[in-house]
Amino acid sequence: MDTWLEFARGPLFALTFLIMLVGLARLVVIQVYSLTTNKGRRLTDAPWRNILSEAASWLVPVRHLIPGTKVFSTVSFLFHIGAIVVPLALVDHVALWNAWLGTRLPSLGRGLADYLTLFTIACVVTLLAYRTFVPRLRTMSMRADYVLLVLVLLPFASGYCAAHPNVNPLPWNAMMLTHLLSAELLFVLVPFTKLAHIVLFFFDRISGIHWQLRPGAGDRVAEELFGEEVKV
């Protein structure tokens, strides 16, 4: 088991993290190439202030919430925060980043990190419940939506259990290996699934350049097509 742990911490972590970085870079290159090819010099005439303002408004997307999906959308928004902050700022993770990058990055206190981890787990469970039991969300959900939520839940739950022996049902080595492997599976999946939007948020939200839409037009078009059941 120790050999597997060392492999998961070392070569496998490096390989899967590299796959994620290269995959995300590929998506950025494709989007930038598409923009420059299709728009060319017209990019200089694009309404950049409106586009950037619209993208920034999604950082706290209160005005984008559509009636009937407010609770689901709010939980989804909060989940995204936890899904970014915990992997980047948890003290054990920061120690790993510092070892790899040779930096001295700040980290969350362990107590705060525990609460944020539990909060993120609760958000994932809530999203699963909504997709399962709310008819309008169930009809919009595909099998991949459920699978991805479960896969996202695994590294958070296993990491918390590994750090807290009193709630850990498995030997520490087994739980830590589960944590590492589930996280590394997500590394590989991120560039090839909708999980990429968590990382490429800004690039997703400036797609108005492609269509030369007025600010808020995307929301209005989606609501006109799909009504209140549109995904937010």
State each model region's role.
Residues M1-V232:
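Membrane-embedded alpha-helical bundles that constitute the cytochrome b-like, heme-associated redox core
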